[in-house]
Amino acid sequence: MPPERRRRMKLDRRTGAKPKRKPGMRPDWKAGAGPGGPPQKPAPSSQRKPPARPSAAAAAIAVAAAEEERRLRQRNRLRLEEDKPAVERCLEELVFGDVENDEDALLRRLRGPRVQEHEDSGDSEVENEAKGNFPPQKKPVWVDEEDEDEEMVDMMNNRFRKDMMKNASESKLSKDNLKKRLKEEFQHAMGGVPAWAETTKRKTSSDDESEEDEDDLLQRTGNFISTSTSLPRGILKMKNCQHANAERPTVARISSVQFHPGAQIVMVAGLDNAVSLFQVDGKTNPKIQSIYLERFPIFKACFSANGEEVLATSTHSKVLYVYDMLAGKLIPVHQVRGLKEKIVRSFEVSPDGSFLLINGIAGYLHLLAMKTKELIGSMKINGRVAASTFSSDSKKVYASSGDGEVYVWDVNSRKCLNRFVDEGSLYGLSIATSRNGQYVACGSNCGVVNIYNQDSCLQETNPKPIKAIMNLVTGVTSLTFNPTTEILAIASEKMKEAVRLVHLPSCTVFSNFPVIKNKNISHVHTMDFSPRSGYFALGNEKGKALMYRLHHYSDF
């Protein structure tokens, strides 16, 4: 290269200007392999560089144009909406919903359920694809005739199934018919379909609602399931427990069954001259102690209000036995000063533990001090005293007479506050008051139990019963309210299985008690509920103290 040209190239490089080239000429370093090499062929089309992406300014212009178009559409739609009458706008909102700011939602609704079937339901794409690729269900190649024939079940040779036969032609039943018959028998015994056996269809919510519910569920801690505080009517959930006196069996009639007011203990007494105490566990009920009273068939035994004493009377004696549980001493009360009764049998203890009421002969009621066993005073009614009881506050005494009348006495003044005729009663047999001071129940000789409001018994001369229970046909000899005043137990000792449990305040009878087919209750002479209604016990003439666990109540 000449020296002048080299100098010119150096000057051009320093100044930043490129040397002038003739048109159609290429630099030597691109045209050949080297400065002096032969020219190369142009690169193939596959090696060309991709076209450059649009610049950010162009993208911004496109976004602005789309936004401007959306604004124009929104303005035009609003103008059209202004021209529509209010009725038409309301109708569109009811049909299409509120899609004022969401045109895509309107389009999805107009597409119909066909599009919704293919919408994503929350599953992954793989799961959705797998659901669509299920092979069609294949039909069986052949059908076995023996499989289609219904298998017949013999009803005659099974003693349990024989009772379910309605007539002699049902000596054999198919499995389906037997299943239906068993279902009918169960519902008849339970008084309907239990809540746990009901098959109710629950409505499924949308995905958004379920997610909201899940969020609400996770926002708090604690118990989400709680039992109802009030006892439902219809069916009483209960189960049979071991007999209370299983560890001391007897064949003599049980005259008294009572739960201890403070401990998990039940007392059983009867005509076998013994008072027995058992620990209640529902399984074995181990015996704690038995007190034998010689030649003293027990008519009634009862705990004191504080649970420290047991009082017992006999069928043919005027002696009142008092057993001190703390000291372990048996104290006989042979004679009460001023009391001229030859036989002391029926008595009641006041809820506050202050008084002892003895039902005498010739219509006399004797009030004694519980602590000293001394006579305070006497009250007299017309006719014979059939039954008596204290009010829940221990301030009043209710007495049922043999003439079908009910007397209400004031304990402090020993004056008669009211007197009324028990509706439909020829002569009374039993009476009971609820612990909440709301109800008075009167049982008569014709099997009717009238339930009154206590306020009406105090204020009205002819009160009307809230409800007359007519489920018994013989004289009602036992009445007992449970501590929560939700159950009234009624029974008659004159007929087998004559015991019912009445739901309050509906005054309806629980349909699943007693189970008539079992027939293990027999003649009921006494009943009682545990302090918190967890257990129910009754004594019969066969010497058994039957006990049941009431599942609605969690405590003893």
UniProtKB/Swiss-Prot annotation:
Chief place of localization: nucleus
Bias (Low complexity): 43-65
Record GO cellular component, one term: nucleoplasm
WD repeat copies, ranges: 249-288, 293-333, 339-380, 381-419, 421-462, 471-512
Pfam family, one: WD40
PROSITE patterns: WD_REPEATS_1 (PS00678), WD_REPEATS_2 (PS50082), WD_REPEATS_REGION (PS50294)
Record's keyword annotation contains rRNA processing: yes
Bias (Basic residues): 1-24
Residues in cross-link Glycyl lysine isopeptide (Lys-Gly) (interchain with G-Cter in SUMO2): K84, K183, K201, K517
Its job: Part of the small subunit (SSU) processome, first precursor of the small eukaryotic ribosomal subunit. During the assembly of the SSU processome in the nucleolus, many ribosome biogenesis factors, an RNA chaperone and ribosomal proteins associate with the nascent pre-rRNA and work in concert to generate RNA folding, modifications, rearrangements and cleavage as well as targeted degradation of pre-ribosomal RNA by the RNA exosome. Involved in nucleolar processing of pre-18S ribosomal RNA.
Subunit structure of this chain's protein: Part of the small subunit (SSU) processome, composed of more than 70 proteins and the RNA chaperone small nucleolar RNA (snoRNA) U3.
Protein name, entry field: U3 small nucleolar RNA-associated protein 18 homolog
